[in-house]
Amino acid sequence: MKSKEENMPNIVLPNYEHSILNTITSILKYYNVETKHKSLESLDNILKKKYRNVVLIILDGMGEHILTPISPNGFFKKHEVEKVTSVYPSTTTAALTTYYAGKPPYETGWIAWSQYFKEYGRAVDMLAHIESYKHDSLKDARENVFETIMNYKTVFQQIEEFAKIKAYEIMPSYSDRRSKRTIKADTIDEIIDNIETLVENPEKKFIMAYSDNPDGLLHKYGTDSKEATDFIKEAEQKISEMCNKLPDDTIVIISADHGHKNIEKSYSILDYPDLQECFIMPPALESRCLTFWIKPNMKEKLNFGL
């Protein structure tokens, strides 16, 4: 009989000593922010040089297994410092919040795209702030959980408090602002233009820039698509050109939040009415990490093979 591990081939588990959490912890440590998490030694060594500008660029979805086949000898791979894992669940909501908060998902509570809240009696899309299934607005709810139980102190706030410098975020125009110094940018060109403009300012600063691609293209077209390949190659070329122009007192750290893998076969719960009969309410969280609310009299009927 096979073990559980043998039944789960090619599963990449998070390593919380070599993960994106440790990457952002190194940046917090550089700015003397108090944190209980371990930093990334390889990045700590690079940051021993005191930089005027620290720039973190997050390319959503551009994991190791996406980048390497597309550009095995490009600018990103040539300057690779270390391979790190994402957090769990390895999804934008959980991973991006790890960068924003400097804490893992099990501390922030930001664990998935769609999370159930008793305050609303329904599942909510965490980044869009809407009801998950009917996409209803939550504006008339008695409590805004994003201002109460789901609120957290951002790395921008922490860095400005401890280091007494300005911390900027560069984000897509649809995103919620997490810094009091937020700049909207929807393309790689706009991201680069804003980084170059900020770096020209002689003050010390931290800049975090986020691109929602290649993730959006990977979801829509797949990991082997021309669309995703073209974006990554173009972004790599333009970021390389930018880095070559930036002054020596500026460091650019480039990372992903998670990777991607094509699915071979998909299943819909809607095709299994007997299974739906067991649920109190629809599943939530992520397709890669689902939660189920099971009717008490149906628990013995279900067997998930665990």
What are these regions (language model features)?
Residues 1-306:
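Feature captures the catalytic ectodomains and active-site-proximal regions of enzymes
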